[in-house]
């Protein structure tokens, strides 16, 4: 959307039997890399394009961001099941966007942002706990230094 390069036709892709998945586009054309945000953008843009509130429902979009994406790349993940990779996010339900508890999936797709993610577990390893990544100070310092070098070249 930022580059105004067109709008994806969700319904046509479904009719054609295309497996729909979600991903982030990369920082060069989509300054953020949040799958939570991408779920909302995918759901709302599909509804706007089709002029139908029943297109790209929350459960479908959540699946596009999880199990469908993993399956498309042949990764044994995307759902919690015996024999699958132990990948999970722990969500902080005490965030304002998560208060309405009629549908956790709906809240994640339409109301949440990445700040609701408390803990990230990938292949059984805790990568982020209580919103802290080991070594994040050094990672941020390196990022700031790299950004400063890029700005200096302009």
Give the ranges of each region predicted by the language model.
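Helical hairpin unit composed of two closely spaced alpha helices linked by a short loop
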Residues: 3-4
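Charged helix-capping and loop-helix junction motifs
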Residues: 7-10, 105
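His/Asp/Glu-enriched, well-ordered alpha-helical/loop segment
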Residues: 11-95, 109-113
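Active-site microenvironment of metallo-dependent hydrolases
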Residues: 65-154
């Amino acid at each position: 959307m930022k580059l105004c390069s067109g709008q994806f036709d969700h319904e046509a892709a479904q009719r054609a039997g295309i497996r729909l998945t979600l991903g982030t586009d990369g920082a060069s054309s989509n300054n953020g890399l949040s799958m939570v945000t991408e779920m909302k953008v995918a759901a709302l843009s599909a509804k706007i394009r089709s002029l139908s509130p029943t297109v790209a429902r929350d459960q479908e979009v959540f699946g596009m961001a999880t199990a469908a994406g993993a399956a498309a790349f042949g990764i044994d993940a995307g759902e919690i099941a015996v024999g699958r990779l132990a990948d999970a996010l722990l969500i902080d339900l005490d965030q304002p966007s998560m208060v309405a508890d009629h549908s956790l999936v709906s809240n994640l797709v339409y109301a949440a942002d990445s700040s609701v993610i408390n803990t990230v577990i990938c292949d059984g390893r805790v990568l982020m706990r209580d919103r802290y990544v080991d070594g994040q100070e050094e990672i941020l310092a390196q990022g700031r230094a790299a950004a400063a070098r890029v700005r200096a070249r302009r």
